[in-house]
Amino acid sequence: MTLDLDANKKDDKILITTIQQEYKILAEYKMIESEKLGGIYTIPSLANSLQWFGVFFGRQGLYSESVFRFSLLLPDRFPDDKSLPTVIFQQNILHPHVCPYTNSLDISHAFPEWRCGEDHLWQLFKYMQAIFSDPIDSIRGIEMDKIKNPEAAELLLTNREEFAARVLENIKESKEHIYDPQPTEDPHYIVFEKFQPDVHGPVLERIKAGRNNQTDSTLQQTNGGTATGLSWVKEGEFKPLSIE
């Protein structure tokens, strides 16, 4: 009888810990939403909240026009664990902070360890935006042997034209596979569809109409109103259209 009670208490403790962790992860997701990170779309897997799906859209610099899929893997005890989250891109990317063998992103220069309550996932994504916007600045002050891909760093510093050409190859390759069949049945996996006028046309028109009305609504927003809307991908391109 005592053994049964101890087992029940242990099960209850595990359940409570799991529920608390789920709430903390949900809070992280809500913070990402509130930050309105332009060019980064991410969502936890329905099957496992420790695994997230994501897409990065480059908006400026050498990586502008890029569309890179990535996975975000959280440690088992996140966010209480000091271990860092893992970002793994689904394609080869030439960048000083991306491992050429595993496609994993090195975030240790910004986050030596994960500090619960101080470090948040939206900050990680902000860092991702920054290092792709200005890769040269991202390696400034870092010793070459501490960089995940020193060959990429050396090429960036000594032959920027060649570096840019190889990055363009990465971008082209990623776009060629953007419509590939999804590798998982998880309904939260981010899927791209080719533009279909009968399906997506009405949505695009609503977006255009909303943008035309933005000027008229500016005064209302200043007085406390908010504007919301839909996002989509422009026909023939990979730029997200959005009303925020």
Curated annotation (Swiss-Prot):
It comes from the Eukaryota. Residues 20-176 form the UBC core domain. CDD domains: UEV_AKTIP. Gene3D superfamilies: Ubiquitin Conjugating Enzyme. InterPro entries: UBQ-conjugat_E2_core, UBQ-conjugating_enzyme/RWD. Belongs to the ubiquitin-conjugating enzyme family. FTS subfamily. This is Protein crossbronx. The lineage of its organism: Eukaryota, Metazoa, Ecdysozoa, Arthropoda, Hexapoda. The gene is cbx.
